[in-house]
Amino acid sequence: MANPEPSPLMSEFQHLMIQVRSGNSAEFAVKSNDILLRARSGEHKDSELEALVRMERALFGIGDEERIGTELRWCMDRFNSISPGSLNHGISILNMAAWHRNKGETMMALATHSNLSPSSGHPKQLLGLSRLEVGRMLASLDDLSTAMRHLWAARGFLSESEMVPEALAASLEWLDIALDEVNDIAPRMQERIQNAKPRNESGTTWIPANSQDVREVVEMLLPVLLADVSGTDRADLGLVLDAAEMLEEEGWIASLVEKAEDIQDPRLLELLQS
């Protein structure tokens, strides 16, 4: 079923946002306020558009700074009421969570992210971005095993959504944690995700990575990373080399050596030549 045509007022707002994203934001405050007033009442009344405009104005920093969080929460609650599980609802959750994190309220940010879930029908690309952020926050709290689960889920959602740069980031961040300890008998990541349960006690956890999961990630990363090995700080290629040495994968090392003439990272070159 085709999406309905946007209303003239919604089209006007969409055009305004295109201008803003092109760098023409000088009149955003005035024009968005005019659209907001029309969306609130009369023949143009549109609750979804009102929430969209208020969310963008809050993100733009229009109004009292103390009220930005209140505005973002109002928008999230409004989208939850009129279109739960929608793209706009998911974006409003991400914005609210980011606001909490920027305020240093990590636990509130994590709690907000929990409102994004497959069972609620949220788009996979938003689920992927959410899991990526949750994984990063958990890693910052040293809850590495749980962080690995979320990063693994993120790479799956992001890959399915063809968000290649974000999927690569999730894969590399997972690998960076996983290489702390790898063996052949640890549960696979998919099993860990499926069997995950709320913990009865607070604190950090650790479960080693399974070597097959490491191989899966590196085999996905290697051709992409080798396509361009330039740059003087290539920690990503360093992770691949670490994984190759840990798992005794001579083929991975050989692939890196073949690119030695193009590699510019002095530390990586030294390791390859040692």
Tell where the protein language model's regions lie, with residue ranges:
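Structural signature of alpha-solenoid helical repeat scaffolds
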Residues: 3-4, 43, 83-84, 122, ...
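Structural signature of alpha-solenoid helical repeat junctions
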Residues: 7, 47-49, 84-88, 126, ...
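"A position-specific structural signal for the A-helix of alpha-solenoid helical repeats
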Residues: 14, 18, 47, 53-56, ...
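Residue at a conserved register position within TPR or TPR-like alpha-solenoid repeats
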Residues: 19, 39, 59, 100, ...
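Amphipathic alpha-helical segments of tetratricopeptide repeats
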Residues: 33-40, 73-81, 114-121, 152-160, ...
